[in-house]
Structures are given as structure tokens and as C-alpha cells.
């Protein structure tokens, strides 16, 4: 299992602290049962942290023309026509994917094109599955222009636990499916804003896989 670069320092820190904790427990607590419990609990916690930062090798091998690939693992929690007010200032179809703590938290580029807009905004830390998290939470907004001039907006949203959004792209950068967009640490959500004529290929509560599940088809 590959570990994502965003998790290496955290994993090392957690490992070091757990070693100190268990050494201290061994030296100061003279009860074998308590020490064994500490070892087991530490091993379980460390395993969860390592699994969270896993970085799977996923390559989409199909035709990428006119499709929108899921930018993240998770569950579809919202599909609705909304007024997007930050960039488009017009109605779009919003698809929201909630990433639970057990999901891979790598984010992928959903379409081929060029980045034309990127803004990071500080904000609140509401639960990521709530609709208001899209406009009130800490978030990064990326807009990608397709070759035909059409724009698709993607928004990385921090949740209650997630306090750090990593975004690798910047304006004027060419991007394509199979490339990583970024990473959100410890629970989060991704919003997609698509043209009204997009053919939506997912349903509410459907589980999706990043860089694998086709969520929509564009004209």
C-alpha cells in the first residue's frame, strides 16, 4: 500500500508519540493488562491513520471525451439545480460527494482542460454533509475550461475534522483526468457544478470512486 506524501509527516509524528506513550506506560504503570491495552489501542489507532493516507494507483483507461469523472471517493449526498454565486452567477447542476473518514482522501481532476480560476477561502467548519458547508466552510474553488470553452467548477470543502485543504493546481495550468487535484485531511466534501444540459449518471446515496466512476456526460 502506497502512502500519500501529505501523510508522511503526520504518520511519523503519530508513530513517535505512540512510542513515547507506550514506553512511558511500560515504565510507570506496573500492570501488564493496562500495558497490553495501551499497545493494542495504539496499534489500532496507528493503522487507522496509515489507512487514511493511502494513495491508490488508479488509472482511468476509457475515453475521456465529454465525461466527468468523480474527483473523490465517497457518497453522493446532493444532486440539484442551484444558483452558483461565486464564479458563474447563474444556475448550474450541483453534485456533492461526501468523503467519510474511511474513504481515500485524494482528489482527482474530473475533466480534461485548463485551470482558469483558483481561490482558497477561510471559513467555518460545519459538518461537510450540510448544504451550508458549500458556502460557509473553509474551501478551495477550481474552475476548469474544456477545449470547447465550457467551464466546470469543483470545490474542495473542509468539514468538522478536516482543517487543511491541499490543492496542487493553479491558473493557466493544463490538466487532465488521471492527475491529482489535491488532498483534504480527515473528512470532507467535494462539490461539482456542471452545465444544466449535463447528463447526470449517478444517483443520491450512490457510492462513487475517485478517478473511476463516471458521474456525468457533457455535450
Curated annotation (Swiss-Prot):
**Which post-translational modifications are recorded for this protein?**
Is synthesized initially as an inactive proenzyme. Formation of the active enzyme involves a self-maturation process in which the active site pyruvoyl group is generated from an internal serine residue via an autocatalytic post-translational modification. Two non-identical subunits are generated from the proenzyme in this reaction, and the pyruvate is formed at the N-terminus of the alpha chain, which is derived from the carboxyl end of the proenzyme.
Residues carrying Pyruvic acid (Ser): 188
InterPro entries assigned to the protein according to its UniProt record, in alphabetical order: PS_Dcarbxylase (IPR003817), PSD-A (IPR033175)
Does Cell membrane appear among the keywords? yes
Instruction: Provide the membrane topology annotation.
Output: Peripheral membrane protein
Q: What does this protein do?
A: Catalyzes the formation of phosphatidylethanolamine (PtdEtn) from phosphatidylserine (PtdSer).
Query: What family does the database annotate?
Result: Belongs to the phosphatidylserine decarboxylase family. PSD-A subfamily.
Q: What protein does this entry describe? A: Phosphatidylserine decarboxylase proenzyme
Q: Which organism is it from?
A: Azobacteroides pseudotrichonymphae genomovar. CFP2
Gene encoding this polypeptide?
psd
